């Protein structure tokens, strides 16, 4: 994987999880 992809995923995944779980 590209470092850029990992950085984006590291930022997007927690945000999506936060939005779904409603535990921001």
UniProtKB/Swiss-Prot annotation:
InterPro entries: Antimicrobial_frog_1. Expressed by the skin glands. It is found in: Secreted. Disulfide bonds join 18-24. One of its GO terms (cellular component) is extracellular region. Belongs to the frog skin active peptide (FSAP) family. Brevinin subfamily. This is Brevinin-1JDb. It comes from Odorrana jingdongensis.
